[in-house]
């Protein structure tokens, strides 16, 4: 009897060991099956025909206090259903694709998460402007397209979001569409100092706002770095060969001054309050007058 009890103890221990092992494997399998939900953000890009361009993307996990970059994840750049480039996210969630377009115009690109055991499938879209460098370019301050904000700023930030989204100014979309239909390419410019995603989120919000309100497609530039950011960007564009950018349509005094300091023409719309108009800047009381000023 004692011998049989002693003989049973190893068997019981074995069963417990097997059971614990199965539970561990089960828990591990469940943990591995739970993937993180990521959010993809992509910035617009500008280039010429058959010229390589960097497409910037960012994969994040949204949090209550801050967003966390998801590193080490495979991303794919897709055009018309075909994978044209691949990249891996760094520790901050950023990835950069190199892509050479072979057709002029506005191209829609998709960035998506590739095969990953850690992150669910996600995708985001962006616009790639492939322009002829001889075509005139019109720079438009996004704030000049919107109804007046409740908070003033030297360079108006983009006030988008569920609680603060602004309506477009009357006739702005129609008039800008007429300007871009046969003659101008358009660059939309805004300042986003408080964007914790380094401009990625603001770029996406502007793109959605412009599409919702039927503005013509164009290249979106999100700037940060204070009042001098626009001037530096204009210099970079000219140095990069985009010398046909000679006209601007803006709302703020700082926007107008950046153009005038470089001997570029600028139209302010709508008509500003007294004292806010820089010398040599043209004024349009509304968007229906803008074409007469260019």
Regions found by a protein language model. Give the residues of each.
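Residue-level detector of transmembrane insertion/anchoring sites
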Residues: 14-17, 131
């Amino acid at each position: 009897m004692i011998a049989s009890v002693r003989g049973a103890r190893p068997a019981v221990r074995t069963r417990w060991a097997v059971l614990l092992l199965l539970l561990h494997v089960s828990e591990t399998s469940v943990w591995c099956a739970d993937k993180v939900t990521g959010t993809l953000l992509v910035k617009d890009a500008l280039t010429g025909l058959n010229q390589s361009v960097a497409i910037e993307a960012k994969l994040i996990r949204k949090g209550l206090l801050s967003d966390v970059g998801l590193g080490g994840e495979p991303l794919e750049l897709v055009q018309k259903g075909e994978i044209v480039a691949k990249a891996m996210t760094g520790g901050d969630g950023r990835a950069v694709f190199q892509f050479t377009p072979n057709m002029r115009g506005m191209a829609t690109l998709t960035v998506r998460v590739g095969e990953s055991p850690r992150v669910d499938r996600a995708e985001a879209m962006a616009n790639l402007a492939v322009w002829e460098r001889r075509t005139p370019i019109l720079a438009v301050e996004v704030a000049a397209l919107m109804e007046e904000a409740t908070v003033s700023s030297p360079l108006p930030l983009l006030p988008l979001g569920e609680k603060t989204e602004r309506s477009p100014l009357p006739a702005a979309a129609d008039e800008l569409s007429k300007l871009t239909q046969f003659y101008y390419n358009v660059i939309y410019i805004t300042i986003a100092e408080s964007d914790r995603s380094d401009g990625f989120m603001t770029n996406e919000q502007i793109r959605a706002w412009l599409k919702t309100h039927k503005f013509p497609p164009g290249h979106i530039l999100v700037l940060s770095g204070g009042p001098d950011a626009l001037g530096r960007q204009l210099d970079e564009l000219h140095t990069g060969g985009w010398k046909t950018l000679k006209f601007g349509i803006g709302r703020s005094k700082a926007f107008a001054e950046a153009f005038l300091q470089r001997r570029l023409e600028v139209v302010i719309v709508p008509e500003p309050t007294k004292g806010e108009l820089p010398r040599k800047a043209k004024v349009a009381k509304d968007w229906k007058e803008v074409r007469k000023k260019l």
